[in-house]
Amino acid sequence: MDAAAWSDKVPLFETAKGKDNTLGFTIGTPQIGRVSIKRETDGSAKLNENIRYAGFLASGYAAEEKDAAANETALYVYEMLGKEVGTGEKRGQAAGKPGDQLAKIVVKGGVGGLSTPTLLDTDFDGVVDFAFAGDRGGNMYRFDLRAASPKDWTAVKIFSGSPNKPITSAPAVSRKGTKEYVVIFGTGSEIYQSDLSNTETQSIYGIFQKLDQAPKDLAADKTNQDVAEQNLRKQTITEVEQSYNDGNNQPRTSKALYLSNEKIEETHKGWFINLGSGERVSIKPTMILRTAIVTIRKYTSDGGKTIGKEEAEKDLCMPVSNNKSTVTSTTFLGINADNGGALNSRSARFTPDIFKRELSGFGTQYANGLTQEGIVSFTFIDPNKRTDDPVTADGDSGETGTDKELGLGSGTPNNRCFSGKEGDQRSLLLNNAQSLEVKGRICGLQRISWRELFF
């Protein structure tokens, strides 16, 4: 290929410059989903036409200072292919061009720039209905994509946070019931050098959302909006040192984390958990059944050690250096998405069974989390996953995979138990050559009715 023609031949498109494009540093992950650009008044989508592949890009961060005028808090939505992708006769025909801006949804009162969005398909028809994203002011927003036209797509604040608790990663979404969800996210930043020494208390939040109303009614329903921390149930973390024998029957000790299990009352709009000093969340949580696995990082730096100072006082040509080291740890915390609390035998969990205990009023509680040294990440491996559908059982449309035909979902997916049989090896595969076995409830035959037979 002619190198001079690279910019014209290789990229599918380049976003237009100008007043409608004030993107900052977009360090987040763009999302791709199918959207309807012409919906009915009740918010429903016709699947045979007016469906497009859209790219969702957060505005990012233009300046480190959160209140800087250069920081715009907005969600950009772009036409990806410039073709109709509905199921009707117009499928594949030209419809605009790649890179056209379908919408730019500016968040009023946004702080510090928008972070990576999460896309949600509530009815599993293959069309995205909502997006959720947070800003560096600690606020979480809901973007309703069900209006008649993209120009009418709206954003409302569902949680009011604090600039001391920035949201720099995408939220997870847990499907609690029919069009009832928990939006789960953590706070904290590891973007700027100043973040390294920041010890402000960060938190994990779960905000309840009921999305069963038409667009205008939902926008007017204040019970789903502007929730504050005082409206949430607080859960707490306890660290316990456990003694056990390893596979070689050698005595070992390890620290396990347990969450409280405070009851959610009708007045609560969700839950929250405060983290320890220096801990923060900068990665999207992973949903496994009804358990949210949150990755927590902690950075501890020493004051530095000056080398060569005495020699330099005698000889000005001798170099002086300052060595500073940082120790990192990673905690994986499994959280009951419904109340932010304890895990039982029916919950998806990854901690060894030796770390279980009895909790008053709850029964057998399995440890919620473990801590390891270093920067550790994981991939969830399930041998019984039969498809590469990018839409999860919760409706999160941000996974990798191959889209199904529109409307070809097989009903509401199961997110309460694993398919397969006892003994199947599910695991969190870690990047440090370790793995953690994942256990939980296995789906099986159940009695749904009975009657007595007389002979």
Label each region the model flagged.
Residues 1-455:
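Beta-propeller fold recognition
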